[in-house]
Amino acid sequence: MPTLTALAGTSAPAASAASAASADTTATLAAADWPSIATELDAYGCAPTPQLLTPQQCGTIAALYDRPELFRTTVDMARHRFGSGQYRYFTHDLPAPVADLRRALWPHLLPIARDWAERLGRPAPWPDELEEWLERCHAAGQARSAQILLRYGPGDWNALHRDVFGNMLFPLQAVIGLDAYGTDYTGGEFLLVEQRPRAQSRGTATPLPQGHALIFTTRDRPVRSSRGWSIGPVRHGVSTVRSGRRHALGLVFHDAA
């Protein structure tokens, strides 16, 4: 797959390459075993996709971190007691591969989200088109981009949290590993902790393969109980990076307040 193109003033050959890359990602997601992904989400609260980005594409996206004009804000996690490390929120003028990845994932995540809502007896307010849903977020006062690029060095970590910014919420999100686990960095596993009904919490640690997305629960999910379906609250974070540098791309399907 081709490399990332510029945000503006893209040449015709580069624009054609970007279009081909987007088509490749869409085709890969269309060919993925979504029933198995849904089953794994039901079992663990997270599930990996096939490889969506080449190592070259991953490196190009990771390098965007050093272009501050692409971001609306930078968060120092230690300063806010969120952990250690940094992340940056993109502006709404998303780089094409970031926008394309989110748009390509939406139609596959939407049926799972609607199914979860039905199990929990909740409304499912999400339309077929992502753009229409984001317009509703903006009308409700959630109008800031929530797409993030994260950078961790040795000793950095991310405290358990939820990416919830208001009442407008999509129950699934994705994170894409941009560096090679075990080669570019060690440690830094993705953490998911689920509070189980009348039981101790369950934790899951998942390495992020380079170029793969991990789909996971945003706030809570349906879990089997003696009464049918119960709400399983979930938080996520990142374990301590032991060595190297870890970049990840976070894709959230609602905007921030």
What function would you assign to each model-found segment?
Residues F170, Y181, Y185-A257:
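Catalytic core of Fe(II)/2-oxoglutarate
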Residues M1-A43:
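Fe(II)/2-oxoglutarate
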Residues A47, Q142-P154:
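A short glycine-rich, His/Asp/Glu-containing loop-to-beta-strand
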Residues T54, P154, S243-G244:
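Short strand-connecting beta-turns/loops that link adjacent beta-strands
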Residues N158-F165:
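Histidine-centered catalytic micro-motifs
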Residues Q147-L149, A174-I176, L249-F253:
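A structural signal for short, well-ordered beta-strand segments
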Residues S36-L134:
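Non-heme Fe(II)/2-oxoglutarate
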Residues R151-G153, N167-D184:
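Short, conserved beta-strand element in jelly-roll/cupin
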